[in-house]
């Protein structure tokens, strides 16, 4: 008779060899379905190429792409994934075959914390996605609607500038101030008020944290029990429950409000109005969908936007020549006024400010690997056979540093954008911070309005020094790790008022 320990060991050994067999059979069947596959690095049983991703997958995938080409096939566990690492490959996927690659793969943890993937970013391609994106484009993120929230952006930017002005000569954490700015702007626009409470900050941080944790079950379904054993799944369910309770409370508060003027309407008011209109038209707009869009406005409007602003001001501070040239342009725009407004920026040309925004987003794409897509049908990409169900990763970070496109690709040179029409709005596949095609970010105008106003005023109002006698050129620009790639270390500076 075997002891219980021996039985356990035999069970694990049997399971291991069974999974190797299943994995090899699956790889074999995939190869038979698609005869002309993209080049592929050798993978290990069960985990495939997961071990080769490291702490910075976008960088590891660049190393692999140098060997296997701009369109390669990897296996993340049992999931086949093609990785596009050139503008040409990205264009075939997001333009030529955009519809075939317009759905999202189901991600377990993301689904749990997003009302069963009801937010637009995670939603599979279909009627729900079309309806929700239409609400965004027509009701929440239209040019008229974005402009209607101008006073909120200017109010909160001015409050940040006041705090910095009162701290001149002292060390400040500019990273934290920028994060607070975007949080306050989005909370006022989305929910009608700011949330200073620690529980709110901790809840939103926990949601982002669980989204950034690697989920074994996404790639090796037979090992999904590891997500439960590690506590990840439990954390996700707990965060989802707390998030639902918070958003439900916000909705109920708004349902009891009296009619508001258009200037005073926030996103929740607009969504409730949309819900009533669609109910009258016989196209129900469900409660979970409403709360999912409320959640998405916060996540999409804060994390990536603050990351972008943080990198922009970091690069300008690190390069005094760029700072001086931008200040000269902004001085011309402001004409001696205390602050720069959105109207000032609309009524004047500011090519150098625009060039800095583009160059910073080229070097520091907030989300270096665009959210994964999935093929709904068999298709040929760059001459290779891609089977339905294959996932797609676009390495936007590698494309933005491609030396065949960008001279001195790893250096910060805003001047490169003064003589080119390349933009970040999804029409130029050399620069994809917001993605492109059907799954491109619908909130570009919203994000860039905050970006531009904040950067313009920070540079117009202040000069900056580094603490401890460091030269500006010594500013540490190390990346963090995660879905969103922020600065690894807070941006600590000493501001000085220019006037």
Curated annotation (Swiss-Prot):
Leader sequence range is none
* Organism, scientific name: Tanacetum parthenium (Feverfew)
Q: Locate the residues binding heme.
A: 441
Residue ranges spanning the membrane: these are: 2-22
Subcellular location field: Membrane
Q: Tell me, what does this protein do in biology?
A: Involved in the biosynthesis of germacrene-derived sesquiterpene lactones. Component of the parthenolide biosynthetic pathway; parthenolide and conjugates are promising anti-cancer drugs highly active against colon cancer cells. Catalyzes the conversion of costunolide and parthenolide to 3-beta-hydroxycostunolide and 3-beta-hydroxyparthenolide, respectively.
Q: Does the keyword Transmembrane helix apply?
A: yes
Q: Name one Pfam family in it.
A: p450
Q: Which reaction does it catalyse?
A: (+)-costunolide + reduced [NADPH--hemoprotein reductase] + O2 = 3beta-hydroxycostunolide + oxidized [NADPH--hemoprotein reductase] + H2O + H(+); parthenolide + reduced [NADPH--hemoprotein reductase] + O2 = 3beta-hydroxyparthenolide + oxidized [NADPH--hemoprotein reductase] + H2O + H(+)
Q: Give the family this protein belongs to, as stated in its UniProt record.
A: Belongs to the cytochrome P450 family.
Protein EC: 1.14.14.-
Protein name, as recorded: 3-beta-hydroxylase
Which GO terms of type biological process are on file? Answer: sesquiterpene biosynthetic process; terpenoid biosynthetic process
| Disulphide bond pairs | none
Where does this protein chiefly localize? membrane
The cofactor named in the record is: heme
What GO terms are given for molecular function? costunolide 3beta-hydroxylase activity; heme binding; iron ion binding; parthenolide 3beta-hydroxylase activity
Kindly indicate whether the keyword DNA-binding belongs to this entry.
Answer: no
Q: What is the topology of this protein in the membrane according to its UniProt annotation?
A: Single-pass type II membrane protein
Pathways per UniProt = Secondary metabolite biosynthesis; terpenoid biosynthesis
